[in-house]
A protein has these predicted regions:
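Substrate-engagement module of ASCE P-loop NTPases
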Residues: 8-30
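Amphipathic alpha-helical segments of the small helical/lid subdomains adjacent to P-loop NTPase cores
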Residues: 41-48, 55-123
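Conserved small/polar residues in nucleotide/adenosyl-binding loops
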Residues: 266-268
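Short secondary-structure boundary/capping segments
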Residues: 3-10, 44-59, 121-131, 195-197, ...
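Structural recognition of the conserved hydrophobic beta-strand(s) that form the central parallel beta-sheet
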Residues: 30-37
Length: 268
């Protein structure tokens, strides 16, 4: 709906009517915490509600939306040990596996590494590694946005941009990066103080694998159901040193894919 210009006035009025009563209720409200995925600029949604403090990229609150390694070790030691036992792994190897799969979020810089709490807690509850957060929703809108504006796929993990771009979204913009970042598929990897630029990338393997697997059928002639199998076959052929098998599969894979898209996927 956001990318459909004719619907913006409707969206603006709905959101403004939802938030504006908070201003009138100010004498009765001691603390209000607003959270969501996206803040849109130039929509005048918060015109009347002008006493909001945006802490999205404030360093003191960097870990407020996740679990740090220190917090996990201090408060979830028993869960880690039971999960390690169920996987027949050492505690140290279990921590490394959890970090690789679910850690790596940064909402500002500097920032501690933050685990995705939803995936971490589900892993402890089910005693099984899985893509729990990614499976709660699919990035269909993001992929459509990338295709609509011909965003180069190979640049998705090597993005350099500024803080204001990350902190709000211009509804008229053709850049999908702010939406992808604010939706949790990209995170801050580094910061250049001289130019005040942030480097973005995938936070962890759950997000990277999930996003690329979902992206693949939209850019190549492979169905969503077959893409995990194709990736597994590619990896297996590389590990076995089966060069002929790999090249044959690659040729078949890109037979019906436009040259520009094939080049983008190869760069990944």
């Amino acid at each position: 709906m956001v990318h459909e210009d004719e619907n913006l006035p409707v969206l603006r009025n709905v959101m403004r009517n939802f938030y504006s009563p908070l201003k009138a209720c100010d004498p009765y409200l001691r603390f209000v915490f607003l959270t969501g995925i996206t803040k849109f600029s130039q929509l005048s949604i918060f015109g009347e509600l002008n006493n909001i403090k945006n802490i999205s990229m404030d360093e003191p609150y960097a870990a407020i939306c996740g679990i740090t390694k220190e917090e996990m070790l201090e408060q979830m030691g028993g869960y880690i040990e039971r999960f390690a036992l169920s996987q027949e792994m050492s505690k140290e190897d279990t921590l490394l596996k959890l970090q690789e799969k679910y850690d790596g979020y940064h909402f500002t810089w500097p920032s501690p590494d933050v685990f995705n709490p939803f995936s971490l807690l589900n892993t402890f509850a089910k005693k099984q590694i899985g893509s729990y957060w990614f499976e709660t929703g699919t990035p269909t809108y993001l992929v459509e946005l990338m295709k609509l504006h011909h965003y180069p796929v190979e640049e998705i993990e090597h993005i350099v941009t500024s803080g204001p771009v990350l902190d709000s979204i211009d509804a008229a913009s053709t850049d999908p990066v702010p939406v992808i970042y604010q939706s949790g598929y990209l995170t801050i990897k580094d910061y250049n103080a001289e130019f005040e630029n942030y480097t973005l990338g995938f936070p962890n393997r759950e997000v990277e694998q999930g996003f690329l697997r979902f992206l693949l059928p939209h850019y190549a002639s492979v169905s969503i159901s077959k893409s995990p199998y194709e990736i597994q076959c590619f990896v297996g052929e590389v590990r076995k040193g089966d060069v002929d098998g790999f090249l044959s599969r690659l040729q078949t894979f890109f037979d019906d894919t436009p040259y520009e898209l094939a080049l983008s996927l190869i760069h990944i």
